[in-house]
Amino acid sequence: WYSKETPNSSVGNFGIIINAKADLIREKFFWKNAANTNLSWTKLDDKDDDTDSEDFEVATDIFNLSSLYGYNLTKNFAASAFAEYRSSLINNFNDPGFLDLGVGATWTPFSDLVVVIHPLNYNFVFSSSGNSYESSLGAKIVADYKKEIGNLNIGSNLSVFLSYQDTDYSNYTWTNNLSYTIWKNLGLG
């Protein structure tokens, strides 16, 4: 058992998660689009410290848009093009911002899993602050798993950029979620 660092305190949290998708599935091609936003704020009220902040502070600030177009070569394999944009919304929008554009292949071994492998991908990095970020050519690998079991929704998305120029320019994002649908599209997660 560990005691907390500020024993005479209370914490409040508030968060909003929005996941939207629009898919077009045809016999010869598919087009999958997704938008994900995860925002949360937290407030620590230390009763022993009169100088602590009265405001909620940003705890999570994630914004992601992606679009995948594929032309089916077989039932589970397609030639594809992929675009993905990642940044924050509340603090430092587009600083940094990451835009990936690439071509390659998409494998769907079963309906709940999509694996994107694009050996020709350019990772554009935007930054207006003094931080040093570099755009570069590389490979993009994305694995997206979604499963619904009754009202329980499980999801995991791994997005990896591997720079051909320097491993320091590589980056990844791994997002997992678990939610429960209460009524129609309203849920807890």
Residue ranges and their predicted role:
Residues 43-100:
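Hydrophobic/aromatic-rich structural module bridging two neighboring secondary-structure elements via a short loop
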